[in-house]
């Protein structure tokens, strides 16, 4: 095992562009050591394969370009990965909806235990991952011959997307599943940046009192070029749709600036944003737990503070 180290990273993409989380996942692969290959499964996705070939440190790109993979349905994608898995000691994907859907199926097919949401590589078989909503970090060691791992993208700096020139090798479709078929998708359109990609995020909690009041955040977000997020309490109360949700059961974000407004700071919310570079909290309750992680705190009524903030921008 020790003399055979080779990692396959499953690229996340939309058939035209590689998603940034794949570059963070590659950083984890580099930390493991050994050779690193990328698998692109899609349809009419040569552009993605070309982009992958240019990524720094990638030795080879495997391209499965077939109509069967147009929507990267998890059943077929897992079967495809299994067909090449014997060549690799480690198989990694970002811990996104995509990675969390595909890799557990692969783990079952390979009969190994998946290691989820790693935040650090200690050695080729030992990793750190958060548990209990991020309040503890577990160090786990795997004895499986093939290590199947999802990577928390925010914990790793992305590798450079240029400087490489890897060969691209075609892979044939394998055991395409008819268990599921793609019916359609509804994508929320927004002029604001996507939550996990934004460098500034402003989030509202139960203290916002209504969905209408989120316009106070939106005005500020548009002045700052920020994304708008929310706590689970705000989502459960119906103030905003659940794609706004930041936290353990929502999106994990680590922007340069995170502004928490009317959010008390339950541990599940902190799990989703505590790695942000600078955290600013506005809350009228001076005992709110959010102030314990905030770099800057303002004890104030948000309905006074937000208009003032907006006017000063």
Regions found by a protein language model. Give the residues of each.
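N-terminal glycine-rich FAD/FM-binding segment characteristic of electron-transfer flavoproteins
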Residues: 1-313
